[in-house]
């Protein structure tokens, strides 16, 4: 029986390590007083808050970037001057501009394409910012731009069901898989949408709590896991 399969990938902390980009940049400006994981979750929290305000039209995108940086540093007891904040943003962007797609991910995409699985990206964030990362990763080689679903463009953010339904309206399949690191957005959203979630934990480990969910620690585990789930 030939089922039509769609495999949807998150971007940040899935296709590259955003936590590493942040941590590398942070260490240029201060010595971390707390462990990397806690520091990153603080940054995530501050990023989400700033992005919410930007999405609601309360602040500009560049203000949201300044705010997430200054609040993260404040949380660890460091006051950054506005010059330092700008310097951090530039250093962060420079580090981000050097991200590459690992061979392992390329193999995943090649296998999916070989099996005629429809693959796509579903990511929360500002359109240009997310697109630049996808260009940097050279993603259009495997996933056409029409299948880059970015929350600002589709006007729906994971975990809202609208984001997942938007993908379904563009890609018809019998079974949808969501590959991502974030329990709140990727996993919860996928479960609500009746998709099959796979939590990707290589770069960012989040406790899935009582959610039943398959887990992949490395890209190479993803394809066999999809096969396994399909044959359950």
What are these regions (language model features)?
Residues 23-27, 62-70, 127, 131:
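An amphipathic alpha-helix signature
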Residues 1-5, 110, 126-232:
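Asp-based, Mg2+/Mn2+-dependent phosphohydrolase catalytic module
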Residues 32-43, 75-88, 141-145:
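Short, surface-exposed acidic
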Residues 1-45, 75:
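Active-site neighborhood of HAD-like aspartate-dependent phosphohydrolases
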Residues 20, 24, 66-67, 161, ...:
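A structural signal for well-ordered alpha-helical segments within the folded catalytic domains
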Residues 87-88, 95-100, 105-138, 147-151:
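Substrate-recognition element of Asp-dependent hydrolases with the DxDx(T/V) motif
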Residues 49-90:
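A metal-dependent, Asp-based hydrolase signature
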Residues 10-12, 17, 124, 181, ...:
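Acidic active-site catalytic centers that drive phospho-/nucleotidyl reactions
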């Amino acid at each position: 029986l030939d089922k039509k399969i769609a495999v949807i990938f998150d971007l940040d902390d899935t296709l590259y390590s955003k936590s590493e980009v942040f941590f590398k940049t942070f260490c240029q400006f201060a010595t971390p007083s707390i462990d990397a994981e806690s520091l990153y979750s603080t940054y995530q929290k501050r990023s989400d808050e700033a992005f919410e305000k930007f999405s609601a039209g309360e602040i500009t995108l560049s203000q949201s970037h300044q705010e997430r940086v200054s609040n993260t540093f404040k949380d660890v007891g460091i006051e950054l001057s506005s010059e330092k904040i700008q310097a951090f943003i530039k250093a962060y962007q420079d580090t981000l501009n050097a991200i590459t797609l690992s061979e392992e991910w390329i193999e995943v995409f090649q296998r999916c394409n070989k099996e005629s699985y429809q693959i796509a990206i579903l990511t929360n964030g500002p359109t240009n910012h997310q697109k630049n990362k996808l260009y940097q990763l050279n993603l259009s080689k495997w996933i056409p731009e029409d299948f880059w679903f970015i929350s600002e463009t589709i006007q729906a953010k994971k975990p809202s069901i609208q984001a997942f339904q938007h993908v379904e309206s563009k890609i018809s399949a019998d079974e949808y898989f969501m590959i991502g690191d974030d329990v709140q957005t990727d996993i919860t959203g996928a479960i609500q949408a009746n998709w099959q979630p796979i939590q990707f934990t290589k770069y960012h480990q989040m406790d899935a709590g009582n959610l039943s969910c398959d887990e992949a620690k490395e890209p190479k585990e993803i394809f066999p896991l999809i096969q396994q789930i399909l044959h359950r």
